[in-house]
Amino acid sequence: MSASAAPPNKLPADFLWGFATASFQIEGATDVDGRGKSIWDDFSKIPGKTLDGKNGDVATDSYNRWREDVDLLVQYGVKSYRFSISWSRIIPLGGRNDPVNEAGIKFYSDLIDALLERGIVPFVTLYHWDLPQALHDRYLGWLNKDEIVQDYVRYAGVCFERFGDRVKHWLTMNEPWCISILGYGRGVFAPGRSSDRMRSPEGDSSTEPWIVGHSVILAHAYAVKLYREQFKANRGGQIGITLNGDWAMPYDDSPQNIEAAQHALDVAIGWFADPIYLGQYPAYMKEMLGDRLPEFTPEELAVVKGSSDFYGMNTYTTNLCKAGGEDEFQGNVEYTFTRPDGTQLGTAAHCSWLQDYAPGFRDLLNYLYKRYRKPIYVTENGFAVKDENSKPLEEALKDDDRVHYYQGVTDSLLAAVKEDGVDVRGYFGWSLLDNFEWADGYITRFGVTYVDYDTQKRYPKDSGKFLSQWFPAHIAESPKPAAETKKAATPSPLKPHGAISNGVSKKSSATKEPKSASRKKGRKAPFARFTAYISAFLGL
C-alpha cells in the first residue's frame, strides 16, 4: 500500500516500526563462544575514556537474555527490530582469510529465527562501530583503504550467505560521520586517534577523518555491489546505509547564516550522502578541505553512485547555525540552541548536544527526500531524559520529557508523509533498552525500557507504552489470509512500569531450540568464492 492509498491520518499498512540496538551496546559476553576483540573492548577500559569508568563486558547481557528481549519486542507490538551484528563474533580476527566462527553464526541465526517466528521483521546493521581489533593492529583498520574494503566485503558476504535467506533489510554502516570524526578526529570513540596528545599518543585530526570516511564509503559501496550481483536476484531484499545528521536552521535571516546552515548540512550529511546518491562530494567540502579530501577514481565512483536502495536516517535534534565557526568537523559553523531572543530551542536532554525540537524532524525529512529522492527509513531517533540515571525507578519510568519528544516526532512524521508527500517507510526508536552509551558509559539512558544494571531486569517506561499505542493506531490495516492470521503473534497488553525479569515469561524463556530446518539455515557454506570474487571486482 502506498502512502497515498492509506486512509487519512494513517501510515501505509506495510510501514515498519520498532526499536533499534547495537551489538556492543547490549550484548556483553565479549569473550564468550569464540568472539574476538573489537576496538571498543580495550578502549572502553582505558581510564577516562568513559564517564563512569565502565565498559561493555556485560552491557545489558543480551547475548544471554536475547529471548527475553524478543519477548519485550512482542509485548511492545513492534513490526520490526533493528539490531547489529558483531563483526568479531562472526570472524574473530576479521580478515578475508580468517576463519568464520560458527558459534557466532548460530547466535544471530537463532535470533533471526525467533524474530520471524514472532512476526517481527529483522532489520540488520552489518557495522555499528565495533571493528575487529586484529584489523586495527594489522593495518590501522579504516585508514588502510585497500585492505579494509576487501576484509569488510568478505565479512558482508558471509552475512549475506548465512542470513540472507531470512533477512531482507540490510544496512551496511551505521553513522560514518561518527566513525570518522569521533574515532579519528576528536578521539573520543575507539580507536581514539586525535592530534590532541593529551587524548591520544598518535593520530592526525586534519587528515585521518577524511581518509576514514572515504574508506567507509567504498567498503559500503563494494558490499552493495556484492549483494546486488550475488544475492539479490535469488533472495530479494533491500540494502542501504544509515547516516546521522541533524536539521540545521539558520540562526536568523541573514544571508551568511542561511549559507552557514547549508554548509553544516554539507558536512554532517552531504559528505556521505552526496557521493552515494548524487555521485560527488559536496562542492563546499572540496573547497574547505582541498587535497585533504580523497578523490574517487572513475571506476570507484561508478560503484559508489547509486549504492543505496533507500536513505537510512539517524537524527535526534536541530541546531541553530551561525557563520564564523572554526570547527571543520561542523563545516566551520557555530552551533547553538539559544535563539536570538535568548530562549532555548527546546527541552534539554541529559546530553548537551540534544534538545527537543519536533519541527526540525519534519524539515529534515523533506530536505532529504527532495535532495536525494529515495525512500526513507528513520533508523534511529530518541531522547535522553536529564538526570534519569539518578532518579528512583518509579520516577524514571514516568519519562514525560521522552514521551513529549516522541509525541512531537510522530506528529511530524505523519505530517511529512500525509501532507508533504515524503516517502517514509519505517521508524525505529532509539533504543529498545537503556544500554552502554559509548563514551558516556551507563550514565546516559536512551531506552524506552529501563534496565537495572545490577539485576538486569527490564522495566517498560511510559515512552515505550506511548509508541506501542501510537503506531498501531496510525498504521492502516491490511487484510491477511486466515491461515496467516492464526500464525501471527498476539502481543500481550503492555502495562506501564511492569518488570520483565530473566525468566518471567517462562513459556518464551523456555523456548526450545530452533527446529532442525532452522539450524540448517545457519550451517556452514563455502566461502572461497567470496575471496576470489572480491579481489576480482575490486581490481586487487
From Swiss-Prot:
Name of the molecule in the record: Beta-glucosidase 1B
GO molecular function: cellobiose glucosidase activity
Originating gene: BGL1B
Cited function: Plays an important role in cellulose degradation. Shows hydrolytic activity against several glycosidic compounds.
Enzyme class label: hydrolase
pH dependence per the UniProt record: Optimum pH is 6.0-6.5.
Pfam families documented for this protein: Glyco_hydro_1
Annotated catalytic residues: 175, 380
Keywords from the UniProt entry: Carbohydrate metabolism, Cellulose degradation, Glycosidase, Hydrolase, Polysaccharide degradation
Protein induction: Expressed in cellobiose culture, but repressed in glucose culture.
EC number(s) reported in the record: 3.2.1.21
GO biological process: cellulose catabolic process
Family from the record: Belongs to the glycosyl hydrolase 1 family.
Catalytic activity: Hydrolysis of terminal, non-reducing beta-D-glucosyl residues with release of beta-D-glucose
Domain of life, per lineage: Eukaryota
Origin species: Phanerodontia chrysosporium
